[in-house]
Amino acid sequence: MTFYLFGIRSFPKLWKSPYLGLGPGHSYVSLFLADRCGIRNQQRLFSLKTMSPQNTKATNLIAKARYLRKDEGSNKQVYSVPHFFLAGAAKERSQMNSQTEDHALAPVRNTIQLPTQPLNSEEWDKLKEDLKENTGKTSFESWIISQMAGCHSSIDVAKSLLAWVAAKNNGIVSYDLLVKYLYLCVFHMQTSEVIDVFEIMKARYKTLEPRGYSLLIRGLIHSDRWREALLLLEDIKKVITPSKKNYNDCIQGALLHQDVNTAWNLYQELLGHDIVPMLETLKAFFDFGKDIKDDNYSNKLLDILSYLRNNQLYPGESFAHSIKTWFESVPGKQWKGQFTTVRKSGQCSGCGKTIESIQLSPEEYECLKGKIMRDVIDGGDQYRKTTPQELKRFENFIKSRPPFDVVIDGLNVAKMFPKVRESQLLLNVVSQLAKRNLRLLVLGRKHMLRRSSQWSRDEMEEVQKQASCFFADDISEDDPFLLYATLHSGNHCRFITRDLMRDHKACLPDAKTQRLFFKWQQGHQLAIVNRFPGSKLTFQRILSYDTVVQTTGDSWHIPYDEDLVERCSCEVPTKWLCLHQKT
């Protein structure tokens, strides 16, 4: 798609360029919103550099605690293993298990630098020729504007590019160029430029694509015409449900311009669509609230904290600071906040109060058990690789035995340490647990009973002496069997597997049930700590407390994510905001 470009009155540096001699006029364009506009799959022998240094994000660092201890009578240096469910553990396990590989860098034949100042026609011609010689690219205009957008080049440089293109194409500028120019306008918060393009688009088009609306909304909220962004939001609703970014922009705009009622109405509308709001949206309400002395507003902020709890959401570090600032600004309440941690015992290191237990109540357990049995196990999909006959055989097997204390995913456990024979490792785990007089169930596959380099028949016979065993067909899924056996045995039963059960959690029907499942998982899944060959296996302690936003009325405890710690969805933060009222 192309457009005839006759100029825009707000582009004086473009259309009145001394290099190009173009006069004033009008142009029309459709817009889209993108997080970045870089071009992938560049030629190997070509690299891009800007003439000015680029800002880079801080490298995510995770502190690795190391300590010395005596292990079973021998002096060994042991690396502390992060708890299975604590933030950063998955990344650290990945780093510990990965092998470093050297990757040779492709040779760079030539480099082309992005301009940092407007170029004239001859300079753009030369840059285009240089690119063609180095890479063979013929789509110079599209490529260079993508790189400029990705590197957030200046508006004036982008204008000179558009002017050069217009001069060489009888006033025609492609859609792609205009789109990425507008992206730069929004990024650099050039509101007047966005407004002028908006006026032209209103005159030219009856409707826009959703991404175009999104870019206009983001560009307009900082202007005195921000309410027109709300009209664009209504236009989006005629086609699709607006995104959480659309709502975030409109809410931020409303708060920026002191329209609190509109902001809360948009927030309720967002929740009504079952959209999880951006954390920066929630943070904006707290930032705005420190200047408002209104009980109704305060109650709504407390509702946001309840929403975080019910949906197991964790604020970032900056958001946590905003929450602390708001609490301490509430007149007459004398709230005092501090950033702290929770001890292994479940006590807050700051105030000494006990954090909620990780164990489910009997009512919660029965509710979760029923929904897992119905939605995860009896739903059918989880057993698509299991025959009805085998499923029936397993159910009869479980019902014919007393409840188990520990259910072991045999194949998963056996493969935890690659340098150890699989049957030997499984026997080691079973033997240590059997010494504690625990009733054990090992779930495995039939191939584990066949003699091989990894599976000793003698060791597997010993496993069967110390534990009940069920060996499914080799194509069967293990996890549903493990869930069924553990839940059927009762709330006391634990299970061992490295699997984080993400798929099964996703099968559950609502956020509340998913939260109960994750809480149950944290309180019942045992993890084996890595160790040296020949040393005794160590089972990692189960967290005693529930990492979730919680209150006792005169105190709040809010877990939050540190800025420099990567946390996957199956992990929980280690840092807490402790808030309590002074007495």
From Swiss-Prot:
Name used for this protein in its record: Mitochondrial ribonuclease P catalytic subunit
Query: Cellular location of this protein?
Result: Mitochondrion
Recorded catalytic activity of this chain's protein:
Endonucleolytic cleavage of RNA, removing 5'-extranucleotides from tRNA precursor
- Pfam families with a match to the protein in the record: PRORP
Q: How does it assemble?
A: Catalytic component of mitochondrial ribonuclease P, a complex composed of TRMT10C/MRPP1, HSD17B10/MRPP2 and PRORP/MRPP3.
Query: What's the effect of swapping residue 434 to D?
Result: In COXPD54; uncertain significance
> What does the entry's PTM section describe?
Degraded by LONP1 following mitochondrial unfolded protein response, probably leading to inhibit translation in mitochondrion.
Gene3D superfamilies xrefs:
3.40.50.11980, Tetratricopeptide repeat domain
Membrane-spanning ranges:
none
Q: Which residues carry this modification: Phosphoserine?
A: 98
- Residues that coordinate or bind Mg(2+) 2: 479, 499
| Alphabetical keyword list | Disease variant, Hydrolase, Magnesium, Manganese, Metal-binding, Mitochondrion, Nuclease, Phosphoprotein, Primary mitochondrial disease, Transit peptide, tRNA processing, Zinc
Q: Which organism is it from?
A: Homo sapiens
| Gene Ontology MF term list | metal ion binding; ribonuclease P activity
The cofactor note reads: Binds 2 Mg(2+) or Mg(2+) ions per subunit.
Q: Which disease is it linked to?
A: Combined oxidative phosphorylation deficiency 54: An autosomal recessive, multisystem disorder with highly variable manifestations resulting from defective mitochondrial transcription and translation. Clinical features include early-onset sensorineural hearing loss, sometimes associated with global developmental delay or primary ovarian failure, peripheral hypertonia, seizures, muscle weakness, behavioral abnormalities, and leukoencephalopathy on brain imaging. Serum lactate may or may not be elevated.
Q: Where does Zn(2+) bind?
A: 348, 351, 557, 578
Could you tell me which residue ranges the PRORP domain spans? 342-578
Question: For this UniProt entry, what is the primary localization, expressed as one broad class?
Answer: mitochondrion
